[in-house]
A protein has these predicted regions:
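Metal-centered catalytic cores of metalloenzymes
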Residues: 2-8, 21-87, 91-154
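Hydrophobic helical h-region of N-terminal Sec-dependent signal peptides
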Residues: 11-20
Length: 154
């Protein structure tokens, strides 16, 4: 009887270990796309409060930026309540302004800003991206240095 309880406990422990190992594999798989290229993606929320210095605005935005192996960049952000004049991905930690890395393309609806085809990060820019030191900035006539900002957090 005692041996049977020990045997069942050992089997239960092995099954639990196998389930945890498989769950870990599923999490790792989410970092790969269907062509087995590594993908880092950032969902981004744009607000005036993130600007440096912060601005008061009713405008907002959100989007998703993806960086694949080879450092190619894709994605877009959609804004509301703003007539944007330009939008970029900039280098800079939260609370700091930085240089333009990639200029975004404005759609015909005037509210969607997309990463242009073929855009890539340099190795140094990719390192900054992985550290959370890139951000999206949407400029307007009222706020030439930026009205909406959102930090990219891979």
């Amino acid at each position: 009887m005692k041996l049977s309880i020990i045997f069942r406990s050992a089997i239960s422990a092995m099954v639990a270990s196998a389930v945890l190992a498989l769950a870990g594999c599923a999490t790792m798989e989410s970092a790969w796309d269907s062509t087995k290229n590594f993908v880092a993606a950032s969902n981004v929320k744009l607000t005036g409060a993130e600007e440096v210095p912060p601005v008061t605005t009713a405008a907002s935005g959100s989007g998703r930026i993806t960086v694949k192996e080879g450092m190619s960049v894709s994605g877009s952000v959609k804004t509301t309540g703003i007539v944007g004049t330009a939008a970029h991905i900039h280098a800079g930690a939260a609370g700091k302004n930085g240089a333009v890395v990639i200029a975004l393309t404005k759609s015909s609806d005037g509210n969607t800003w997309s990463v242009p085809d073929g855009a890539k990060l340099t190795a140094a820019q990719y390192k900054e991206y992985k550290a959370g030191n890139l951000y999206i900035n949407v400029h307007s006539a009222a706020h030439k240095s930026g009205e909406l900002r959102g930090q990219l957090k891979p």
